[in-house]
């Protein structure tokens, strides 16, 4: 029977293709910036449980940093993780603004249970225990508190909180005594303490404590010891202490009595710890007096005592193992100094005030452990580690403590820096692993060609220069060939040397010193800019990070635009990239110029931008060093050129009449066109107003400047040519209705000439809404939207044609276009939502175009543009068959064989970047979101290179056989002719 079953299943088996094992593609998975983390308190533990700002719950391998399991929620505020609690093998999360409560099994990441919570503003959540067991989880909302069973999530009871309109309930506290304390505050009036029974939720006691100085409990207050509330007040420079169970008034303790003082303008924080929810909190707590000043205090029997002062501390943390609780303090190895006002923020402070951050001059840090009972430092517990110079400083600290065999304390530390890098450290300072989690939020990406090798550059140097005479050129060619021979010999020796080793021991390490362009230009440098302000140089064929650079003066939410001013084609001039950083709050901008191959800052000094930048233009004009000219237009419509040499200014003056640009003001609903004057001032040439009370501008999409169009028209069935309308200045403007009612919503699209402001075409999709994804290329526009009437996703494609006669075949000018192009339009039904969309691009534009569509499932669909052709006929004719037009069908099917990433899904995909390679058949693709995925696609198959499975042995054998047969046949023919001649 087993043999029969095996024979039955055998035909269903399928082999994995070679490109599915990472030969031409790779994927890197991330979790994002940490929001919550829990490290198992055992020496042999292997898991780190994390909840991140990217709405991810995951477990990391503490020995390698690899992701053991991961669950990513929606990439919207609805999927945000509000709280994360750990108990044994269960991880409890509250998400979706307090609407969903989940329990995860931490070993394999399985979902134990999920329950929906009542609506209401989420405040906090806490585990609740009885005697010696944790049985419940409590969730506090603005107006109610609910208790749920830890085993199945079922609600035990819910209690509405009194006076919730005026009282801000913000804290929960329970210590296994059968009651839950709910703490609320009426700002600048009093503190309210509710004591509820765990069994039925009945309010046992209500207490009001006068606190006219108290505005909020979050951060400024903490519960220590046997339910004692400790709060800090900057106005009176005091600490206030109140027992939640026995006292009804706050006891004031001036800081002067402890020889302490708050920093001016700093909001202090109280950091308490409760190792177990069935026991009381520790009586010891940290009081943060300034960004770099912490004090370890103890509150015992109503008395405050000062245990130890840490005046140069960057981060602190508590950790418990068994009966021992320790405090970890991260300090600079040398003296800390105040940082300049560069937009950096302190250690996860939630206050809105801008504080002085502390930075370490040599980027060398120490972590030490201290006994919380005495403040005494534990010997042999120092971890020393280094961060990159001019890099980010530590932002969060998590400690994993365990007891060694000799009952001494050992620990590991997880440090997260401002640039979202995770480092896992062990004594005495070994970096076990690190993760660059800022790559989970890539905002800008460019691919740059790698430089030539020395031999290739030597050969290139023979061309384009004045002749050195016949002998000189011969000697130069001879030396170049000798260099190539030497490189080839070294390559053969390496192949022979590696062939003698096991495959697992062969190292093909890629480093920044041996980077060189390959034969088909498939290997490139990927320059990625992340939201944290960190730049990466990644080798495209393997995903190896070759360099990274952190910009300290980039604020969160800043707009980042990356431009390539000079490529590697202009040897010996180094390539040059420019990053425009625009602050979200101040609107001020600055330029950062760097070498994309090595990541080093360029010696070229960019201009100082004194006004907010509205628009940038990368012109085809070059300076004497072959750097493209970048024009920056500020809010006063003044133009700044970079570089601004005399040669550049002269070229700008000559070409000013042909330089146009546009500005978009979405708030006012205006599109304005400007032209450049010879004196580098601007003049408004056109304006299009879109009424903001009816619709709003959501997207303005132009064409890629690097795009090449090979075919100027399409040959129709009657052998005539339908010429494309290839307007490089065409803008596609997408609008959405401001009315959100599903019967009145609409999506509009306007095709506007960016030089003249002429509206080429406009159309409206009624009963439709966004989000709208659009691709604008060649003579076509494809955009996707949601049809509210039919409740489905739809594509609409527009194609522009001049007709059967071309108006001006030599040069295009927007100023000389008397006739509007013909616009063909057709819509299609798509069975899935879309996360991102982009078109393939090749070096010459000969290859067929495909649309790369990122789906919410993480798959990337390669859809031939021929399926979205507005000329597809409903009833096929002889001419349409001659053109190979597919008959029109409104449904666009998703076939699994069109997924370019097979099972390598990209979570929370946000964008797709395409780049041409040296092969016309090949397009390089990078999809980024929570993960990064790189691959190659062949829209028209590989027609210009032999496939990897090409049988060289067979074809060589056939050729040798034919040559041998030819020689024998020739000899036999000669003998035959000779014999015939003798007859």
From Swiss-Prot:
Bridged cysteine pairs (disulfide): 221-231, 332-360
GO biological process, alphabetically ordered: protein insertion into ER membrane by stop-transfer membrane-anchor sequence; tail-anchored membrane protein insertion into ER membrane
Cytoplasmic-side segments: 974-983
Membrane topology: Single-pass type I membrane protein
Signal sequence residues: 1-16
Domain of life of the source: Eukaryota
Entry GO terms, CC: EMC complex; endoplasmic reticulum membrane; membrane
Lumenal side: 17-952
Compartment list: Endoplasmic reticulum membrane
Keywords, ordered alphabetically: Disulfide bond, Endoplasmic reticulum, Glycoprotein, Membrane, Signal, Transmembrane, Transmembrane helix
Glycosylation sites: 279, 362, 808, 903
Transmembrane feature ranges: 953-973
Subunit-level organization: Component of the ER membrane protein complex (EMC).
Family (UniProt): Belongs to the EMC1 family.
Function of the protein: Part of the endoplasmic reticulum membrane protein complex (EMC) that enables the energy-independent insertion into endoplasmic reticulum membranes of newly synthesized membrane proteins. Preferentially accommodates proteins with transmembrane domains that are weakly hydrophobic or contain destabilizing features such as charged and aromatic residues. Involved in the cotranslational insertion of multi-pass membrane proteins in which stop-transfer membrane-anchor sequences become ER membrane spanning helices.
Name of the protein in its database record: ER membrane protein complex subunit 1
Taxonomic placement: Eukaryota, Metazoa, Chordata, Craniata, Vertebrata
